[in-house]
């Protein structure tokens, strides 16, 4: 939920101003992950051992407020140059403690800032740790769980058994006492020019840049000599010493830069060479050399971490000519849905091949049940495709909200196939559901938009939706690409079903025409803006439909409430008489999605009920639908496609409507209050 960014320059001279600029740009790339408050920690002016100082600057509000605050710091000389320096930065989405400067990160160990730490995640046992530390005389100043980590590493350091204990050993001892999810980056006055980072359940990657040859492409993983059982004994173990053969560095001890971040969008402008850390990895940089340690060894551990090349371009994470990332991403959907299908759907032979699933296809076809699990928009993509998946696979399909799935301890069997949908691949509840299903022997399939994410690594197989980076907090293009990915799975599963060939060909023809039809829908933007002008002063809104378009209503209502803060509700039209009809009157805006599909006649019944109660329905309908338009207050006519894909076309007007409503109401579309893009805590 929070954004972590850190930058180390080793033998690369940088002024403090240049370091600030790098840190701030990194935070701005991560601001969609949280924007309650932000902070940085950099070296002070003194380099003498007894006078070393870490300067903290923290500010409530967005990164821009922090940027302005940095240049008000009279005590810092922006022109001073550092040949080697390590700076850390953080943008926060509050989970413990209100958004203010004291609760912002970096959190510190004491008033002298001996150790500072930035954190993404939640420490579930922080109260016990805090109680222990308070009993040892450590004083706390914030309400955060993160401050416990800073105080704990200070405790380990204060009680060290030897003066030459390494920074990574301290961190190793600390994380064995932590329960919950975390990505952490540490800085200390006792280890100048050194960095230590670690993760468990929250994402963290390291970018490396050097104009010189690197020592290796595979960094070996190192292990400690023993494990620590409890917090009272954490000062009694040793880490073995390192040598250059176990580290990544520029050959000849030359200049090198390291970038630590929660995701790749903050790194790509600097380098496309990255290392994805695994859970419980501890990455340490000292003297320009990166080493990776692990707390425990298991038989399934990969013995090394490879440097990978990001397939991303900087322009993909820039707004271009659009006023907001969300608007840009809505208008990117003709390209994003094409990219999702590219190389997978052969329109000449009517075949579909998902390379990430091909090795497990026989096992998937033998399954007895499909379980599709997600949260928010990803859950809606599952709802949208449930009917066509049942039709094409001829299997029962359960669609589950990850949190509810876990709360119920849902029975899962070895002959189930479980899908986990997440744009970021890091959604905490979905990740926990994945581990729950793996423990019960089910085959697990990930559907994500992020290479190297936790879900993509931990599932048995998966589909990368190839939608491109999505920065706007309100998901748009990821939804339509997830939708198509699930449809493609159904098509692949039904390839040898003779009775379904005509239906398959109809759907594949629909997929082929989809990018052009989306462009046609996007051309209605001005008309939708005019509709928003009529609606933006309203306090509540109903969106109703049924069949294939029920998910459209859920997703449209979610988009409206996410970024406009209007109350909106997605209603199954078949449930209208069972309560929601009581809300309908001439003041209540009602949007109805009525398409020429098998539910058309039933939707007409719902329309009659709404108009009979003096409702003024705004209808999304097919171009040739004269019947619905007779009863409509307003209509938005959409091109027609095959019924199971119509939801892709009908959701786009609701995405546009939510965008225009938010702008007219004066809200920041890309940064809705209380929300973050990547939900990495429960």
From Swiss-Prot:
PROSITE patterns linked: GATASE_TYPE_2 (PS51278), SIS (PS51464)
Family annotation (InterPro entries): GATase_2_dom, GFAT, GFAT_N, GlmS/AgaS_SIS, GlmS/FrlB_SIS, Ntn_hydrolases_N, SIS_dom, SIS_dom_sf
Native source organism of the sequence: Mus musculus
UniProt entry keywords in alphabetical sequence: Aminotransferase, Glutamine amidotransferase, Phosphoprotein, Repeat, Transferase
NCBIfam families (alphabetical): glmS, PRK00331.1
Any one GO MF annotation of this record: glutamine-fructose-6-phosphate transaminase (isomerizing) activity
Record domain SIS: where: 360-499, 531-672
Active site feature: 2 (for gatase activity)
Function: Controls the flux of glucose into the hexosamine pathway. Most likely involved in regulating the availability of precursors for N- and O-linked glycosylation of proteins.
Domain Glutamine amidotransferase type-2: 2-288
Biological process according to GO: cellular response to leukemia inhibitory factor; fructose 6-phosphate metabolic process; glutamine metabolic process; UDP-N-acetylglucosamine biosynthetic process
Domain of life: Eukaryota
UniProt-listed Enzyme Commission number(s): 2.6.1.16
Pathway it works in: Nucleotide-sugar biosynthesis; UDP-N-acetyl-alpha-D-glucosamine biosynthesis; alpha-D-glucosamine 6-phosphate from D-fructose 6-phosphate: step 1/1
Chain sites annotated for binding substrate: 377-378, 422-424, 427, 578
UniProt cross-references to Pfam families, sorted A to Z: GATase_6 (PF13522), SIS (PF01380)
Residues found modified as Phosphoserine: 244
Entry keyword annotation includes Phosphoprotein: yes
Catalytic activity: D-fructose 6-phosphate + L-glutamine = D-glucosamine 6-phosphate + L-glutamate
Protein name in the entry: Glutamine--fructose-6-phosphate aminotransferase [isomerizing] 2
């Amino acid at each position: 939920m929070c954004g972590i960014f850190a930058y180390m320059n080793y033998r690369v001279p940088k002024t403090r101003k240049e370091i600030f600029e790098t840190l701030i740009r990194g935070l701005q790339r991560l601001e969609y992950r949280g924007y309650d408050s932000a902070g940085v920690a950099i070296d002070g002016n003194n380099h003498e051992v007894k006078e070393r100082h870490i300067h903290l600057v923290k500010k409530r509000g967005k990164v821009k407020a922090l940027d302005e605050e940095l240049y008000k710091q009279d005590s810092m000389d922006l022109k001073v140059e550092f040949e080697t320096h390590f700076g850390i930065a953080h943008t926060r989405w509050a989970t413990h403690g209100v958004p203010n400067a004291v609760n912002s990160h970096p959190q510190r160990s004491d008033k002298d800032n001996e150790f500072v730490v930035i954190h993404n995640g939640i420490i579930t046992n922080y109260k016990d740790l805090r109680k222990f530390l308070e009993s040892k005389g450590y004083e706390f100043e914030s309400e955060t769980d993160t401050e416990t980590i800073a105080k704990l590493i200070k405790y380990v350091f204060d009680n060290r058994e030897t003066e030459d204990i390494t920074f990574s050993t301290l961190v190793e001892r600390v994380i064995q006492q932590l329960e919950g999810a975390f990505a952490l980056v540490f800085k200390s006055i006792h280890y100048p020019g050194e960095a230590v980072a670690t993760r468990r359940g929250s994402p963290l990657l390291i970018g490396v840049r050097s104009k010189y040859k690197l020592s290796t492409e595979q960094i070996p993983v190192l292990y400690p000599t023993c494990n620590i059982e409890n917090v009272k004994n954490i000062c009694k173990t040793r880490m073995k010493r390192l040598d250059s053969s176990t580290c990544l560095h520029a050959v000849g001890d030359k200049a090198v830069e390291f970038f630590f971040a929660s995701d790749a969008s903050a790194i790509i402008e600097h380098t496309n060479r990255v290392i994805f850390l695994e859970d419980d990895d501890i990455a340490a940089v000292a003297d320009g050399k990166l080493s990776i340690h692990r707390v425990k060894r298991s038989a399934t551990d990969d013995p090394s971490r490879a440097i990978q090349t990001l397939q991303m371009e900087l322009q993909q994470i820039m707004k271009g000519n659009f006023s907001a990332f969300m608007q840009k991403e809505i208008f990117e959907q003709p390209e994003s849905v094409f990219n999702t299908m590219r190389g997978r759907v052969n329109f000449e032979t009517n075949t579909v091949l998902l390379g990430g699933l091909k090795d497990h296809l026989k096992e998937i076809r033998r399954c007895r049940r499909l379980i599709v699990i997600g949260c928010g928009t990803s859950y809606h993509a599952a709802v949208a495709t449930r009917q066509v998946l049942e039709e094409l696979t001829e299997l029962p399909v359960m669609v589950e909200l990850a949190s509810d799935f876990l709360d119920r301890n849902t029975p899962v069997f070895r002959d189930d196939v479980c899908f986990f949908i997440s744009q970021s691949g890091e959604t905490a509840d979905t990740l926990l559901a994945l581990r729950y299903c793996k423990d019960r022997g089910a085959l697990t399939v990930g559907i994500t938009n992020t290479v190297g994410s936790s879900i993509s690594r931990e599932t048995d197989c998966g589909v990368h939706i190839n939608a491109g980076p999505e920065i706007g907090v309100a998901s748009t293009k990821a939804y339509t690409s997830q939708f198509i990915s699930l449809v493609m799975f159904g098509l692949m599963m039904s390839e040898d079903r003779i009775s379904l060939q005509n239906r398959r060909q109809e759907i594949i023809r629909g997929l082929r025409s989809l990018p052009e039809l989306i462009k046609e829908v996007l051309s209605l933007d001005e008309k939708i803006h005019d509709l928003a002008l009529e609606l933006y002063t309203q306090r509540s809104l109903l969106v109703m439909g049924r069949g294939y378009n029920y998910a459209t209503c859920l997703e449209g209502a979610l988009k409206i409430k996410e970024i406009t803060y209007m109350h909106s509700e997605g209603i199954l039209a078949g449930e209208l008489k069972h309560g929601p009809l009581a809300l309908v009157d001439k003041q209540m805006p009602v949007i109805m999605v009525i398409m020429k599909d098998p539910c058309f006649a039933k939707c007409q019944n719902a329309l009659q009920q709404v108009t009979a109660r003096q409702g003024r329905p705004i209808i999304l309908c097919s171009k040739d639908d004269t019947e619905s338009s007779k009863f409509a207050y307003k209509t938005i006519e959409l091109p027609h496609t095959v019924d199971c894909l119509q939801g892709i076309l009908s959701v786009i007007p609701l995405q546009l409507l939510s965008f225009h409503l938010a702008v007219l109401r004066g809200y920041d579309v890309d940064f809705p209050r209380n929300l973050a893009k990547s939900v990495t805590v429960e």
